[in-house]
């Protein structure tokens, strides 16, 4: 996104501990602005999901949690409060439509519980209970498909029509006259 004021950290990888587990995130851009840390994640999809759907995404929850815990390494402010962290999704198909998702202490605590429960569920599961999907169409786009002997590299997501999400979860309110051309 153009005209961002503050210190910029592009392609930044941060990690933090959650219990006995390490969480890692690679951010498109972290912007340090005054006392705040702002995540920018750009998406190239043609359809823009609803804000509620973005808020519930694992990516949103994980990125904000990790930045809250590890973001002090980017500033001289000391420990970060969740209210100092926000995440912005920027859709290249509609550059003026930035979706901003602020964070809160209440949501932060819910996210910690959510990821602790996922980690425990993984630990509790026996190896034979990690099953492969029967839907081979999903495998075509999975970056881990080689681990299951279902191909070597994932397919192009631009050709994938559905992520199992209802169409009404997406908004497509574009005015093509307002969209600037992107230079390469």
What residue spans do the PLM features occupy?
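Cys/His-rich metal-chelating microdomains
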Residues: 145, 151
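A non-catalytic, helix-rich entry segment at domain boundaries
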Residues: 1-10
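Acidic, low-complexity intrinsically disordered tails
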Residues: 156-184
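Basic, low-complexity terminal or inter-domain segments flanking catalytic cores
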Residues: 126-132, 152-155, 160
């Amino acid at each position: 996104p153009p005209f961002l004021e503050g210190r910029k950290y592009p392609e930044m990888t941060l990690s933090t501990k959650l219990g006995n587990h390490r969480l890692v995130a690679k951010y498109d851009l972290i912007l340090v602005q005054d006392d705040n840390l702002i995540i920018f994640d750009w998406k190239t999809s043609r359809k823009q999901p609803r804000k509620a759907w973005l808020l519930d995404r694992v990516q949103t929850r994980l990125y904000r949690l990790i930045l809250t815990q590890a973001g002090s390494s980017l500033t001289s402010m000391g420990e970060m409060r969740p209210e100092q962290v926000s995440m912005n999704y920027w859709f290249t198909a509609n550059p003026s439509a930035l979706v901003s998702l602020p964070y809160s202490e209440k949501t932060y605590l819910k996210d910690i519980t959510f990821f602790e429960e996922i980690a425990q569920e993984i630990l509790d599961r026996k190896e034979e209970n990690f099953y492969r999907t029967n839907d081979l169409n999903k495998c075509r786009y999975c970056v881990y498909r080689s681990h299951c002997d279902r191909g070597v590299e994932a397919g192009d997501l631009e050709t994938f029509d559905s992520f199992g999400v209802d169409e009404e979860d997406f908004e497509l309110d574009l005015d093509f006259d307002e969209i600037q051309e992107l230079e390469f």
